[in-house]
Amino acid sequence: MVSTVFPHDFLWGAATSAFQVEGAYNEDGKGLSLADLRSMAIDPAEEPTKALANVGDTLADSRVASDFYHRWQEDLRLMKELGLKSYRFSIAWTRIFPNGDEAQPNAKGLEFYDHVIDRLREYGIEPVVTIYHFDFPC
């Protein structure tokens, strides 16, 4: 039997995408992404007003997801307790540039990710950031 040993610096970890975990789809200046619209089954070309409105329960998946946006401190604490050495996550483009074409980034979005990265480092968890994970701005 062959024994496989992982290197001592192997990054055991977890991974998520912003759309799948963050929720808070319309908070702190975040814009709608194509993934948000797909979850609503709305064609922005046909229904632009409805696409930009708060459409209630039809946006359940991206509206709440696992609520990482509000529960990130607890979630990262649990990752630390698990002994994870890395966390690969994506940054929601629409949280930084809500419409995708702003000259200045959304300060609240930057602040959120700064806090997440700072806490990961505090816990000794290596942040591995994906800039784009299927959440192109509308």
Predicted regions and their residues:
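Aromatic- and acidic-residue-enriched carbohydrate-binding clefts of CAZyme catalytic domains
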Residues: D28-R63, D101-A107, D135
